[in-house]
């Protein structure tokens, strides 16, 4: 189990405990101590130091407004739900690493290729679509891309199954794995569960949280999820046996 709470100002302990309690009510309990990204700064710093030693990282003083102005001058407009490519303003400036600056990975030119278990052959030119991306933010917080790559390795993750809204993160993570000499997991990106307005179900969009107040309600929540996933209906009176049936029926 891993809690991806690297954005500490937005992630609260109470929310973490609520998630863990809901999972436990549904019969999902971690086999190992829960990993909290908010407590892993030293591991991320070790990875960043390794990248710095190979000149794969540089300091950047650009604000979001600076980047937006530069891109606007180039005729590039920001799009909702899409990364804005960094124009490389600070790449060759050789700035000293100082407080208030972000740290970016020098992204190599060329396509990154990988095989997705559901989407098939995938490729992305990160240098063009994203540019040199942030590893440590100007406010001192670690970026998700670095954190998740380090954590996947430290937890021995061999297969990543996640929503297809994260598919375009994969190429960046592969570049980091290659730069750090880390193993590359097998990836599969699944369809999202959407609300009536087409937005994904998430707390960001105000989706209702699970009601797991009783074992019966927890089982109902699991049954609803199984239905969306196309898993068979089963006659079970508890979460543990239901989960075991669905694990055996999972086709991928």
Outline where the language-model segments fall:
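N-terminal Rossmann-like or analogous alpha/beta NTP/dinucleotide-binding catalytic cores
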Residues: 1-76, 164-182, 236-237, 241
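Short, charged low-complexity intrinsically disordered segments located at boundaries
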Residues: 19, 48-55, 78-81, 201-210, ...
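Noncatalytic linker/hinge segments flanking ATPase motor cores
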Residues: 40-45, 146, 150, 190-191, ...
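Active-site cores that bind ATP or allylic diphosphates and position pyrophosphate for catalysis
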Residues: 65-213
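Non-catalytic terminal extensions that flank enzyme cores
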Residues: 94, 108-110, 199-252
């Amino acid at each position: 189990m891993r809690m991806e709470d690297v954005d500490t100002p937005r992630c609260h302990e109470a929310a973490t405990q609520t998630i863990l309690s809901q999972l436990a009510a549904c019969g999902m309990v971690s086999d190992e101590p829960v990993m909290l990204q908010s407590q892993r700064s030293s591991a991320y710093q070790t990875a960043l130091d390794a990248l710095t030693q190979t000149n794969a990282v540089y300091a950047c003083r650009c604000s979001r407004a600076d980047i937006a102005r530069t891109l606007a001058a180039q005729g590039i407009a920001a799009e909702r739900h899409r990364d804005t490519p960094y124009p490389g303003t600070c790449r060759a400036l050789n700035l000293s690493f100082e407080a208030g600056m972000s740290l970016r990975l020098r992204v190599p030119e060329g396509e990154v290729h990988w095989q997705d278990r559901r989407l098939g052959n995938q490729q992305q030119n990160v240098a063009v679509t994203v540019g040199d991306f942030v590893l440590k933010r100007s406010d001192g917080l670690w970026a998700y891309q670095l954190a998740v790559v380090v954590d996947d390795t430290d937890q021995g993750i061999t297969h990543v199954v996640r929503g297809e809204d994260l598919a375009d993160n994969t190429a960046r993570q592969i570049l980091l794995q290659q730069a750090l000499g880390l193993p590359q997991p097998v990836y599969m990106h699944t369809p999202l569960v959407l609300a009536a307005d087409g937005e994904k179900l998430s707390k960001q969009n105000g989706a209702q949280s699970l009601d797991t107040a009783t074992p019966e309600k927890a089982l109902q929540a699991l049954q609803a999820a199984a239905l969306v996933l196309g898993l068979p209906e089963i006659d079970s009176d508890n979460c543990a046996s239901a989960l075991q049936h669905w694990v055996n029926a999972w086709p991928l």
